[in-house]
Amino acid sequence: MACMHQAQLYNDLEELLTGPSVPIVAGAAGAAALTAYINAKYHIAHDLKTLGGGLTQSSEAIDFINRRVAQKRVLTHHIFQEQVQKQSNHPFLIFEGKTWSYKEFSEAYTRVANWLIDELDVQVGEMVAIDGGNSAEHLMLWLALDAIGAATSFLNWNLTGAGLIHCIKLCECRFVIADIDIKANIEPCRGELEETGINIHYYDPSFISSLPNNTPIPDSRTENIELDSVRGLIYTSGTTGLPKGVFISTGRELRTDWSISKYLNLKPTDRMYTCMPLYHAAAHSLCTASVIHGGGTVVLSRKFSHKKFWPEVVASEANIIQYVGELGRYLLNGPKSPYDRAHKVQMAWGNGMRPDVWEAFRERFNIPIIHELYAATDGLGSMTNRNAGPFTANCIALRGLIWHWKFRNQEVLVKMDLDTDEIMRDRNGFAIRCAVNEPGQMLFRLTPETLAGAPSYYNNETATQSRRITDVFQKGDLWFKSGDMLRQDAEGRVYFVDRLGDTFRWKSENVSTNEVADVMGTFPQIAETNVYGVLVPGNDGRVRSLNCHGRRRDRVDIRFAALAKHARDRLPGYAVPLFLRVTPALEYTGTLKIQKGRLKQEGIDPDKISGEDKLYWLPPGSDIYLPFGKMEWQGIVDKRIRL
C-alpha cells in the first residue's frame, strides 16, 4: 500500500537479520525467539492467513468456481438444494418465533417458483423487482426467482415517488412483486408504471401459503446460465441524484458468498442474526447467502428494535450477530438489560463499528470477536479485521510485509483535494502517494484480467466510467476509485476516515446530496441549495444539512413548516435534512462548483457560524424547522438531545 514502501520494508528486514542490534542466538530457542520477533514486527502469520483465506482469489476459489461451472450448478438455489440433500431437517430460517428447516423452506419457495412460471410466465434471465420489508416471504421470492433462472431487482421499500419509479424503470422489469404492507408507497406510482407495461402484484403470508403447485423445478431450466449473466440489482445512492443499480453477476454472487462462508468458517452449527434490510448486500450476501453456503441458520428480524434485538438473539441461540456501525451505538445507548450477557454470541460481523463504540460494545455485551469488513456493493476489493484485542481495535485491516510485497502496487492511497474531491497530482501530472498516517482515497488497480469483474452500474455507462481513472502513476494505467478516505499507520493498521463526494451514510442508508438538493430546490421560496453531511457528536455517519438561500423577497421569511412538509412528502425519512443553514448567497469554485469544504468543517456549531448565516433544525417529532442555537447545540453535545 502507499504508506509503506517496499524498498524500506526490505531494508528493515535485512537490518533485522544482519544488523548488530540483533543478539546472536543459537539453537532452537534462539530461532524460535527470532521467528516470533519477525512475525510480531511484520505480521507474517497474519498475512499468510489472510492471503490464504476465502476473500482472496486463491487456487481453492478458482477450483470451486470451475467445479460449479462443470456441474452446471452456479446458483444459490443449487447450493440450497444440496443442503436439503445433506441436512433436510436442519433449521434454515428463524423468523418471529417460527422455524423453517431447509426442506420446508425449499418446498415453500418451490411453490412460489411454480407460481412465477405458471401465472406470470417469468422467463430465464428475466428481471423481476421485489419490494418489501424483511420477512420469510421476501426470502422465498428471491430464492424462487433464482430457482427459475430469473434475476432479482431488490428495491428499497422506503422509496416512493420519483425515486421508486426510477428504480423500477431502470431494471426494465415486467413485474413488481410488493409486500402488501407497503402498498401506500406503491399505489401513487401505479399509473405511471402501468403506462409503461409494468404490472404490480402484492403478497402476504396467506397468499404465499395458498400457492398449491410444489412440482420440483427441473435442473434443465438453469443448466445454461453463464457466470457473466445478471443475477440481481442492488441499489445505491450516487452523485447523479437518483439510486443506481449495481450489476450483480452470477459469478460475483457465487464467488462472494462462497468466499465469505469460507473466510468466516461458517458451519451448520452457526446461527447468524441480522436485522439489516434484505434489499442491502449486508443481509442478502454477507449473511443469508453466505450462511446457505455454510449450511447454517439465518435468524432474521423484521427490523432493528432496541426492545427486540437481544431477546431475539437470546431466544434463537444465535452465535453470530451482524452489525453496521450505527447499530453498535444504538445498542450501547439502550438501557441495560439482563439480556445483555445472556446470549451465546461469539462474534459480531459487519462494517462501520466506530472507534468510540468498539471496546465499549465488546465489554458491555461480552462478545470476544469483532469482525470488521470494509467493502461496498459498488466497490472493488475488500479488507477485514478479525479483532480480539487492543492492537487492531478500531481498524479495518492489518497489512504486513508479505501483503505489501504482493499488493503494494494494486491498492494505493493517494492525496486528495478535499475542497474539490479531486486527486492531487505532482508537477508531472501523476498522483501522489500518501505518507504514513496521512488520509487519502483508496484506489484499486484495474488490469485486463480484473477489468471484467470490476463493478458496474446497470444501464448507466457514464456512472460506471466515473469510478475509473487513468494516468494515475503512469500514462495509460487504469484504476478504480473507492470514494473513501483511509489511512495506514506505521504498524500497518488501516483505518477508515470518511466518505468522499456527494454521498454519505446516515442510519445505515446512503444519502445522495444531489437527490436531496433537487427535491429541496423545488420549494417555491428557495433559490439555490447545497446539501452536505455534517458530523454530530455522539452520532455515526453524517447528518443531512441544507445550505440554501431564499428568493430575494423571501430571504428571511421562509415558511419553515411548509418546507418541512415538502421534504417529508418527497424524500425517505433518512434523507430529510435535519439542519438548515440559510445564507445570503452560496459559494462557488472558479469552475462553478459549489463549495462544501468550509461548510463541512464548521458543521452545526453555532460558535463557528459567521456572517449573516442563520441555523435552523427539525427537532425529533417536530413539523417545523426552528432556530438552532447554543442551547440546542449543547443539548446534542451532552446527549440530552438524540437525533
Swiss-Prot record:
Spans through the membrane: 16-36, 139-159
Alphabetized PANTHER family for the sequence: FATTY ACID TRANSPORT PROTEIN 3, ISOFORM A, LONG-CHAIN FATTY ACID TRANSPORT PROTEIN
Listed CDD domains: FATP_chFAT1_like (cd05937)
Membrane topology category: Multi-pass membrane protein
Free-text domain note: The FACS motif is required for catalytic activity and substrate specificity.
SUPFAM superfamilies documented for this protein: Acetyl-CoA synthetase-like (SSF56801)
Cytoplasmic topology ranges: 1-15, 160-249, 319-643
Motif segment (FACS): 477-525
The family this protein is said to belong to: Belongs to the ATP-dependent AMP-binding enzyme family.
One Pfam family of this chain: AMP-binding
Name assigned to this protein: Very long-chain fatty acid transport protein
Localization, UniProt: Lipid droplet; Cell membrane; Peroxisome membrane; Peroxisome
Organism ancestry: Eukaryota, Fungi, Dikarya, Ascomycota, Pezizomycotina
Gene name of the record: FAT1
Location, primary (coarse class): other
GO biological process: long-chain fatty acid import into cell
Gene Ontology CC annotations of this record: cytoplasmic side of plasma membrane; lipid droplet; peroxisomal membrane
Keywords attached to this entry: ATP-binding, Cell membrane, Ligase, Lipid droplet, Lipid transport, Membrane, Nucleotide-binding, Peroxisome, Transmembrane, Transmembrane helix, Transport
Stored InterPro entries: AMP-bd_C_sf, AMP-binding_CS, AMP-dep_synth/lig_dom, ANL_N_sf
Gene Ontology molecular function: any one: long-chain fatty acid transmembrane transporter activity
Annotated EC: 6.2.1.-
Residues noted as binding ATP in the record, renumbered to the chain: 235-246
Extracellular side: 37-138
Organism: Cochliobolus heterostrophus (Southern corn leaf blight fungus)
Catalytically driven reaction(s): a very long-chain fatty acid + ATP + CoA = a very long-chain fatty acyl-CoA + AMP + diphosphate
Residue ranges within the lipid bilayer that do not cross it: 250-318
